[in-house]
Amino acid sequence: MMNGLRRTFWSSIHKKKDNNRVDDSLDRQKPTTTSRFGFFSNPSTPRSETRPDSVTCSPTIPCQSWSATAISTPSPSLPASPKLQCDTSGDVTPTRNRSPLSFLSVSSSSSTPSSPKSPASFSLLKSKLCFTKVRILNRNNQVNIFKNNSKLTFLRLCYEQSSISSSKCGICLQSAKAGRGTAIFTAECSHTFHFPCVASRAGDRNLLSDCPVCGASWRETSLLPLSLSSSLHESGSESDSKIRESKNNNKSLRVYNDDEPLISSPISRTGFNTIPESNEDEEEEDNDDGEFKGFYVNTPSPLTTKKMLTDSVTGHVDVKLSSEAAIVAVGRGNETYSVLMKIKSPSLPTARRSPVDLVTVIDVSGGNIEMVKRAMRQVISSLRETDRLSMVSFSSSSKRLTPLRRMTANGRRLARRIVDDISGDGDGMSVNDAVKKAAKVIEDRRQKNLFTTIFVLTDRNRNSAHQAQLAQPDFVTSTRFSHLEIPTHTIWLGACNHALPEDVFAKRIKSLLSLSVQDLTLNLGLVSGSGQGKVTSVYSLSGRPVWLGSGLIRLGDMYGDEEREVLVELKSPSSSRSQRIMTVRSRHVDPTTQEIKNYEDRALMIPRPTTVRSSDPSIARLRNLHVSTRAVAESRRLVEVNDYSGAERMLTSARALLVQYGLSSSDSCLRGLEAELADLNRLRGRHVAVKSPEPVVQKSEPLTPTSAWRAAERLAKVAIMRKHMNRVSDLHGFENARF
């Protein structure tokens, strides 16, 4: 039967009459996949009516150039036999290039037809066995390959061999099996490629927009380089990439950009500035007298308004020295003494207070949650319409309760309702996460007020080393958080032995919301005519003792009527008994106008230093305060450079000196040093635990088939070694069986 089919098939070959039939056949060709034996396929299978225009012959198999057409006779088993054509130029030279990717240049010149009896059947059968898929594409990945007077500009034949379905790369045709040390990329069409092969084609977007094997469009390119992924998505799937990027950002870190617009935003979405909402109480007061007051009413003039805006700018920072100075050390020809300095910021009128963006972090894990709610209601009442408030609660986890919302009448009502509904229970260990979330709210806001701050409300007690040194402990501690230098105030409601009066608490909250001076710096010195001497060190007493500097100290931002204390250490010759004068020059930035204000030097009389032998107990207290404050501040400077031994020696020597002075264990200075020693030991233990030698852990590598294979091999080796170590003889247990 096969011989009959072969005779019937080849008897229908005749010579080609016209060379233009090549062009017609190529125009009718479609990028379809042919089977290996097209003339034995199912009748329903689509067939290619032509064959490639040139054939690269193997040097071991002779192939003459020929031009013929084979038309099969219809039969029940073969209703539509294909029509075969093969044209080559007259001078066909054998080549040894067996690369699977070949580029064929087709000439428009006609070739001389050869005899139809040439032995091309075996070559045709060989080509059918070697090639599985043939696809002809031009530069635009279209089927039509003729342009500019029917001249072929670019022709690419992409084909697969019969064995590259899943085990070879579709680009380099090398082995693409897992475990060979090369990352494998599997496309949506299930074709596999080497990842370096795919990445190397990132320069041309057309090369990777479709699969090099089957031509399927690639849409999921998450494993490709970012530049490649962006170029591919620009061509067809920009919306999909934006959705995926937004999902990834939401998974990593949420963005809080849903803040309410400011009351007088310079740029409004609608194109005009909104009208400020008035207070209901003010409307009632204004509507009390509805009579016409005439044309000459007492309205504030522009000059009066300007004066009101500049009242706080002209206020100086008040600096005073205490009336005592205690000698703390006596050396050869000089003596060291210390004196207290009090700094108070000017008061700020409520009308001139800058709008504030406030984020409150509420601790709902304590037992006295009603105290926290009462304090939060007082904070809400202290805000104005131009202020914005956001609330974050935390217990075992943190949660943002409200976005930044203006405190209008409706805003206050909604905030109070949320505070009334607060209830929680937990261990309160997520305070750091809550503060980070509060800082993220401030960082992601779309519109910004001039002043921002964070309040942390908790009913816990302060348990710190520096707090024990203060005679009157404060229930507010201040610091700065994150790279934005956000002022963060922790209000320790549990530190108050009794409930604070509402007016005292409200006054303190308003002072924390009123930024009086910004970036305050003081330049301290001694008048040259008042004897030789210098300022050696300045230590902060507000909060944790910190070394501020020697002559130029930076105090940062200060709020309305805020008071701070610093301890100034001076050194002067012992023989000089003249009156010494200190000069103070202040410099700060006005928070409203952002103008830099420099003030002239002010002279302060330094009190005469007194030894501790005097009967005044304040001198001994000042000396003890200097010893403990200096030890804590200097130990912290040593801890910053990881000198834990030096810091411990500093604290222990100061403690021994205070014990030598006759202080009892209940003294605040001794308790502060002991608490600082406990903190230092905890920090040292943590530092040693980090630097302690740990078992060698191999570097983690990305999860790939190669890494998984290596991990499996390591586990197998460990299992074999354990089995070998636990192996016993076959006669184990039968030594005393007496065979």
Swiss-Prot record:
Annotated stretches, region: Disordered = 19-56, 72-120, 232-291
Organism per entry: Arabidopsis thaliana
- Which reactions appear under catalytic activity for this entry? S-ubiquitinyl-[E2 ubiquitin-conjugating enzyme]-L-cysteine + [acceptor protein]-L-lysine = [E2 ubiquitin-conjugating enzyme]-L-cysteine + N(6)-ubiquitinyl-[acceptor protein]-L-lysine
Q: Where is the VWFA domain?
A: 357-459
UniProt keyword annotations, A-Z: Metal-binding, Transferase, Ubl conjugation pathway, Zinc, Zinc-finger
Where is the sequence biased in composition, kind Polar residues?
A: 31-56, 86-98, 265-276
Q: Where are the zinc fingers (RING-type)?
A: 169-214
- Name the gene that codes for it: EDA40
Does the keyword Methyltransferase feature in the UniProt annotation?
Answer: no
**Documented EC number(s):** 2.3.2.27
Q: What is this protein called?
A: Probable E3 ubiquitin-protein ligase EDA40
- Basic and acidic residues bias: where? 19-30, 235-248
* Chain's role: Probable E3 ubiquitin-protein ligase involved in female gametophyte development. Required for fusion of polar nuclei in the embryo sac.
Record-linked Pfam families: VWA_2, WAV3_C, zf-RING_11
Compositional bias, Low complexity, is annotated for 99-120
